[in-house]
Every structure is written in structure tokens, then in C-alpha cells.
């Protein structure tokens, strides 16, 4: 009821988006009826005993996703409702890993940095297998046993080096610092300090002082307190952004929780593999499998979401072949069809193992969950204990012991890969919502995705390419069409947000938007400086807007005219801002005539410089990129596009993995953006060339005569 209360408050009072559920709580019909989750557990065979059963010792927890922006507001609401002394975040303890222990000790010992770095480079990410075939745990003792150079350092005649290794071994694994758990939160009926020791910690984002328990999460449960998880999910923010774009551009109030789960356009998008920008399904490999699978039901999407991960991925080709009838669907026992039909005879979910253990061997609900846990965590002793019960139960139901043994061994092999269906179903529904929006409201959705990706301009560039392939133009910022973030204009094209321009702060954009909303579009740059507060929207902001092309739609003054000095050495931009300040001062200090009428003193509008040298396309594009981080109105390679597409067999974004091009001659075309020249240790020259093409940027190393 506590969880239901803050979820209700999030939706009804705080305008915060809430996810449909996650984890085992989605198997609870009570949680569904209370509105905590939005996935019908009966319809999708989600099991309550994963959430709660008599054999479960620990208290169940309900993890809830909120949109990124709203999570903090929900936590504040909870704090106000229950009292600041009754709630607390959870502390985390950061321990010294192997490399960090060496570095910290080396710094105190004043061991030269080069030697410290060399020691750290000797530490592998993973130790080799031991004589028993097992991979030893990574720690300094095991690393020393496996690596001769570290053994030499441990017994070195240099006391500094020897002591560094000795003290690092002693300090490894000790607590080095504290932090705050990313999502864990405690709500207590009493003052929380009556139950556990409390400290304070600074919130890295808001700089607020937070109450924190001094016990870690795993210890908290032993005190009897319940941990609640408040998670921030970026995808919910994207969906919220898209819904706002739909409302603003089309006037439609769409309820995303009530969309059809059988929308043809959405399934066509999945069948075409056009999932860039959607949740969970956008990787290149997933796109390939979707095109092969041709999903036609929501169950297909749940299964693909569960299968596309290391381990079960090997079953995807068989899953696809069985769906299309290219491989026979077989069941070890006829009764297994009931629970494996939706996944074409392949065990995909942990819940299937639980249901089948009951069906075949009469396991109780609690026992089936214990089996799921034992298989997932490879608890050999527990499995050995449950094996006779499974065989005996199956024999009692008339099944062949050899077939039962095969089923058991198959489960043991696959159970560590099997996925939680409750979680896969919830997240597949969120993924479906994003695909629905992309299929039915493409401009509005892609604008939302780009707004939430501004910190990664490479991702924005890829999303712009995706928009182009969808027939959607991504236009540069415009003073009369742009908002703070990406938006959709009346033609259905996406406009860059003014907040994406370097040098234009959020305060300046809000000032521009508030004035535009109040008194209509700006008619010219003169009209702009006459109306906006020039303390907030200052010269730097106006310059950045001009050079980014936000005033191009006025058509009277070019970008270079703003910043090229005139005959008196002053730029038009300087004169324009001075004019705006004078105009606003005159308006404020208007004089009264004899009859009391208000008359503003006329201020002369400055003229932009004439006959100045126009910027080349490359110069204009480079300034655009400096301010926005990306080429918008064109690309320096546009004149060579046909040649590049005809001649080149490799793109810059493929440099990350050149395995497919082994033993091949490759041709790359692009623009050189940086060049570093140096000498190797042997005195030979080398160069590092940074190049960029339409796909992205990369570096090429050239040596000797290259």
C-alpha cells in the first residue's frame, strides 16, 4: 500500500511517468489490481511465487521505474509524507581493487609514477585457468602466483617496490570511500536512527545533504527494515517527451498505456528491423534477427527480449526456424506443449521451468521457485537433493525415467541462461510503446529521443541519419520555431532546440520563449533585441544564435554580417545589442507630452555592413559545428558523396572492429580534422590522422614511409 501510494502520487499529483513494473512484482495480481504494475500476470503466465512464497526468507521488494526528471520529486514527496527523520538513502562502501591498491600505496611510498603504471599494466582483467580447470578469483595474491614479473616485484631488492606490493596486499579489499546507493531508499515507521546508525552524504547532482544509513543494503534487511527501489528510466522520459511533442504539434492527448497491443504499423516496424531509437531492440544484431523472425505477436517480442543476451542467443536461429516451420517443434513429453507452445518448444523463461516441474513431478509452488533459484545460481547440493524428487514425481505420473533425466539435464544446462519472464514482459511493453510511437508518430518520437541524447552528439548524428532515411528533415535552430529541446514544426520536420547551442543558456531560451508566447513571433533581429531582456539573453547568446543560423529565416542579414567589423571597426552585433539596450531604456523612461500622451524617443536601427566577403560553405559549416557539435545544414563531404559511395568499401564507424576486413584492401574517404606527428622510441616518424565521414570519426596510425 505504501508503494501504491507513492505511485498514485507520482501519476496524479506530480506528473511523473511510472513504468509498468519490473522484476518479480509483475507476477502479483494484487500489485496489478492496485495499479502498481500494468501487466496482467494471468494473461502472460507470470508467477506470484517468484515474488512471495512460504519458502522465501527475505522480504520481497517492489522496484519501480520513474522518468529521470521526476524521480527526485517522488523522493521529496515520500520524505515530506513520512518525515525526514523516518526515511533515508542507503550508503555504499567502495573497496580497493587490485590496481587501485597498488596505485594508492605507490603514491604514498613515492614510487615513481612510471613504475606504478607498469605494475598496474601487469594485472590482467582475468586470470588464466588453474590446474583444476577453474579460473582463480582476481586478487593480488593470485595475480602474483600467475605473473612472473609481479613475483619479481614482490621479492625485489628495491625496498620501495617490495613494500608497495606488501602493503597493497594488506590494503586490497579494504574500504576506500563511501557513496550513496543509486536507487535504494528506506521508509521506517519510527525515527530511522532508532533502528540503524545514520550519517549524511552529499547528493552529487543537487549538492543536497542526504540522510544515509551507515549499513549497506545487504545488512539493512537483517535489521527488519524494508528497502524500496526508486529507479530512473531514461526511456520513460523519452516517451513523456514524445507525448508532449504530439500534444503540441498535433493537439492529440495520447494515453500511452491504452494503445493497441496489436497495432499493424508497430509490428511492421519490428519486421523491417527499423528499431533505431527504440528501447531494448535497437542493436544491429537484434535488427537482423527481427527481420528474420518477422514477429507477429507480443509473445514473440517478449521471447526475443529474453533470448538476446549472452548464452541463450545461440537458440535464436532455432527459435526463428521453428516459428516459420523450417524446423520441427518437438516436446519431450506431450504435457510440455501447454507451457512451451508460445516459445516454439524452446525453454526461454525461468517461469516455464517452474510450471513444468509442477506439471511433470508435482512440485509445490514453493519447491518450483526453489528449483528455479538453485538452477539459476548453480547450487549443486540443492539440485542433487531435488533430483530424486523430480524423478520420483515424474515416475508417479507415468513418465519414462530416461526422458525425465534428459529433461532435468536440459534444464540444468539452460537454467543459468533462462530469463525472468515477469521482467522481460514489463520491459517488452515499454519497448513496444516506443516502437508504437516511432511507427505512428515518427517525427514527434524521434524529436523526443534526440532531446534526451544531447549529451552524446555522435548518437544525435546517427538519429538524424535515421530520420533522413524515414523521410524526416532535421532542421537547424530557428528563433520562431525552436523550443528549448528538439521539437516538431507544422510541416512535420524536426527543429533543433535552442538549448543545444553552445553559449545560449537555458535562462536565455526561456526568456525568448516567454516573450514569443506572450507577444507573438519575432519579425526581425531588431524586434528581438527590442523585446527580450538583454541581461538574460546577452550579446554572447545572440551571437551564438546568429552563427548557428537561428536568424536565417529573417532572410535580411547573413551570419557573417553579424560578426564582421564595419568601417568603424565595430561589429553589427555590438551595434545591435547597444541599440536594443537604448531602445528598452527609452521605452522605460518615456517622456510625457503636454497632454499626458506617452511618446518613445526614436532610436536609429543600425545597418549591417555591406559588400563583405561571404563565408565559404566549409567555413559556415565549421562554425555551425563549433556551436552545435554537428553539421546540420550540410556536410563538408557533400560535394564528394557520390565518389565516396562508389569507391569506398569501409566507413569510419567500422574502425572499432576491423575483423570483417581482415586480409582485405580497404578504401576510406573523409575529411581530415586533426593530425598529430611524433617519433617512436626508435626514432622513426609516425602520424595519427583523425578523419571523419558521414558515419562518424576515427583515427588512423601511419608509420615510416606511410
Regions found by a protein language model. Give the residues of each.
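Prokaryote-biased recognition of long, low-complexity C-terminal linker/tail segments
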Residues: 210, 215-216, 461-465, 556-706
